[in-house]
Regions:
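Conserved SET/PR-domain catalytic core that frames the SAM/AdoMet-binding pocket
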Residues: 94-107
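Asparagine-centered strand-capping/turn motif at beta-strand->loop junctions
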Residues: 109-111
Length: 150
């Protein structure tokens, strides 16, 4: 699925140099000439989330973020400007980039039984005490449906 919030990523097999057997894979997350990102990243980081745990929800007032689950499986929950929720599953085995524009609140839940790792590319580097991120709540959202996945 590719749309304004999701871009499917290219995953290529890698081969052993001696006999050409498949020895892994390479996932292309960002190339300058792909034009996936409107602004080049100013900050890149990896964060982990424990099994069954929720990160967020929060809102970035100045920054657009792009997320890729590089280990495990998570669901991103975005609250669009019309108040409707969008749920996007991101899995390291089927990589996709989730785009969260500034002022769109989001959270993510680890759906795997192990720690999941999310790589973030942001168009604005965070600075301590810049008050750019606001914690909020999704009071009308049913978080319990994701607890069954674990």
């Amino acid at each position: 699925m590719s749309n304004e919030y999701v871009t499917n990523l290219e995953m290529l097999p890698t081969k052993d140099i001696t006999d050409n057997h498949i020895n892994g894979s390479l996932t292309v997350i960002w190339r300058d000439w792909d034009n996936i990102l409107k602004n080049y990243p100013k900050m890149v980081y990896a964060s982990s989330v424990l099994p069954g745990e929720i990160k967020g929800p929060h809102i970035h007032t100045k920054r657009t973020s792009h997320f890729v689950c590089i280990h495990g499986k998570v669901v991103f929950v975005l609250k669009k400007s019309d108040g409707k929720y969008l749920e996007i599953i991101s899995d390291a085995k089927k990589p996709s980039m989730v785009h969260v524009p500034k002022n769109i609140p989001s959270a993510h839940v680890n759906l795997s039984n192990d720690i999941s790792t999310v790589l973030t590319l942001a168009d604005l580097a965070c600075k301590h005490n810049d008050n750019e991120m606001l914690n909020i709540s999704f009071d009308d959202y049913d978080w319990s449906k994701w607890k069954k996945s674990i």
